[in-house]
């Protein structure tokens, strides 16, 4: 049995692409905008864990604003990613998650539970267990990071790589 996985490419349009931005503000005193990039009514996205994480951050002194995304066009999603201070992913299951890659492409750091393939490209400090305190710690670590070293997505998430792998697969099927 021959199985191959071709990851979805990150198709953020050029006008939305930005380098990862450092957070600028007063530690544990200023407002942070946390993006929960999904519809909170979807139980597999684990919105409750995101809210608990926000509550812990507020108990530490942060003023937390949590933005959620319901069914939105991609341009609105990318716009929300541009203005957020970080994206928080708490899903119970994901194949990607594509929103993590899109957020990074838009210049917004990601904090995530270890779901899908995030562990293959996110820094270890940005990944936490399914625990609100651990996620709050990861959020603070992410906010502290100056992102001086350029962080980019691996090449296998590019459109060119996707097309090359897809064409190779099609050629093998007809051969």
Language model segments and positions:
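Conserved donor-binding/catalytic core segment of Leloir-type glycosyltransferases
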Residues: 8, 25-45, 51-54
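Short alpha-helical donor nucleotide-sugar binding micro-motif in glycosyltransferases
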Residues: 79-84
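A charged, aromatic-enriched C-terminal amphipathic alpha-helix characteristic of glycosyltransferases
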Residues: 144-174
């Amino acid at each position: 049995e021959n199985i191959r996985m071709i990851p979805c490419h990150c198709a953020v349009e050029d006008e939305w692409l930005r380098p990862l931005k450092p957070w600028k503000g007063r530690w544990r005193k200023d407002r942070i905008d946390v993006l929960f990039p999904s519809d909170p009514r979807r139980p597999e996205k684990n919105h409750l864990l995101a809210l608990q994480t926000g509550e812990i951050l507020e108990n530490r002194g942060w003023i937390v604003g949590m933005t959620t995304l319901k069914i939105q066009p991609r341009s609105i999603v990318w716009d929300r990613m541009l203005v957020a201070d970080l994206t928080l992913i708490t899903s119970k299951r994901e194949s990607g998650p594509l929103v993590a890659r899109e957020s990074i492409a838009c210049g917004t750091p990601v904090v995530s539970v270890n779901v899908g393939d995030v562990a293959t490209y996110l820094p270890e400090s940005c990944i936490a267990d399914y625990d609100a305190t651990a996620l709050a710690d990861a959020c603070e670590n992410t906010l502290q990071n100056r992102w001086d070293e350029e962080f980019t997505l691996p090449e296998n998430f590019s459109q060119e790589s996707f097309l090359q792998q897809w064409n190779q697969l099609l050629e093998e099927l007809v051969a």
